[in-house]
């Protein structure tokens, strides 16, 4: 599977578990330009679990992921404000077929269809082995940065404010700055090196004259 969506989508504000992120990204990969607006997209539960390398056949695993996708909207930054939108308008699980059926929200479709520039494309095999929700998001950000800088032949260096990471990833307030490094950035670095086509190094920066790290590069 290859997924394609507008770069704006990956920098939106949302919090989904790793299984829910993998499931919704798999659904997005099925959407085609010529599809009818009310089309349902089907995924066999066993196929999805195999793709993720999950040995369990527990329906609760999928049920929880589906409920997350339906109940946790995303907040997309727009030129004049924000758009809060659900990933799907409906999710149906058919017991005897072991099939999950999704209807993608109409308001989300401009971010996944008819894309001519400023879009991200990657192979799903890179995120399916990842266990951390943060590692998946960091992979998508870095993949987008890599693609855009390669396109314009620029240096592969990017700077993020730690507060930006906290806001967009909805990192709990209980995570201090050190936790952000060890449980989010370092974990993502380890996961991406082991499972994906992205490698990165980083350094923490202090800006503004204080003793606290405020940025990473």
What is each residue range found by the language model?
Residues 2-217:
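Charged, alpha-helix-forming regions
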